[in-house]
A protein has these predicted regions:
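Structure-specific DNA junction-binding interface
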Residues: 1-99
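Generic amphipathic alpha-helical segments used as scaffolds and interaction surfaces in large
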Residues: 25, 29, 33, 110-117, ...
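Surface-exposed polar/charged interaction patches
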Residues: 45-49, 133-136, 169, 191, ...
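Long, compositionally biased
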Residues: 72, 169-211
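Short, charge-rich amphipathic alpha-helices with coiled-coil/heptad character
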Residues: 99-108
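Membrane-interacting alpha-helical segments
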Residues: 107-125, 173-184
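Amphipathic alpha-helical packing elements
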Residues: 119-171, 175
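Long, low-complexity acidic/proline-rich regions
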Residues: 214-221
Length: 221
């Protein structure tokens, strides 16, 4: 299926996140590449069968295992990051000048979702992409990553080295978006596997609606 067809809505009109829209093709292509790595990580975690495992992995294990590269590419073209790294928790990304407050927040326990070795590399990839967007396209970071304004400010004004060090020390921050909404993921994976464009588009739109609802609930937009 061509990228041109993939950028069309169910009615045959260009989607709001198509390369012709305000976000631009390079930003969206990079997002798709990051998402593909995120999906590969989820597939690997599901195959690992670690215990205790989250319902997102156990209930959808067959879908994760059967998700081939073509299906992953289709699912990866969602116009939002499929994982999160605490981009609505500004205290995690606060400057070193406020280290005491930041360290207290960072000390709060966060259960690691990912236990496979690949998680650290994906965490670095996600945070590097987040830093790039926050420092050059703050509005895009907030839309595509569900990032709060204060997080965008902290990450966008920090050095890449500082953000990378935080990421290396806190790989457990990396979590699936909507990890407790198994049906949302079931819909995305099944439609990506089928390749049915209209159904896949509806799944993407549902994700956008959820992201917007989360933003309103957190007052981050």
């Amino acid at each position: 299926m061509s990228q041109q067809r993939d950028a069309l809505s169910g009615d045959g009109d260009p989607a709001l996140w198509s390369p012709r829209a305000w976000l631009g093709p390079q930003t969206l292509e990079a997002l798709a590449e990051v998402n593909e790595q995120c999906l590969e990580l989820l597939c690997e975690q599901a195959q690992a069968g670690a215990r205790p495992a989250a319902p997102l992995l156990t209930e959808l294990r067959a879908l994760w295992i059967e998700l081939d590269s073509a299906a992953r590419r289709r699912a990866a073209r969602c116009p939002y990051l499929l994982l999160d790294a605490g981009f609505t928790a500004p205290q995690r990304w606060a400057p070193a000048a406020t280290r005491e407050v930041r360290d207290q927040a960072c000390a709060e326990p966060v259960a690691a979702f990912f236990t496979v070795p690949r998680a650290s590399a994906v965490m670095r990839l996600v945070t590097t992409y987040a830093w790039h967007l926050a420092s050059s396209q703050s509005a895009a970071a907030r839309v595509l990553l569900g990032m709060s304004a204060s997080c965008a400010q902290h990450i966008g004004t920090a050095t890449l080295g500082y953000v990378s060090r935080l990421a290396e020390g806190h790989a457990q921050w990396l979590q699936p978006r909507w990890a407790d909404r198994v049906m949302v993921w079931r819909d995305l994976l099944s439609t990506a596997a089928s390749g049915e464009q209209a159904a896949l588009e509806r799944s993407r739109i549902r994700g956008i609606q959820l992201l917007a609802a989360d933003a309103r609930a957190s007052r981050i937009m």
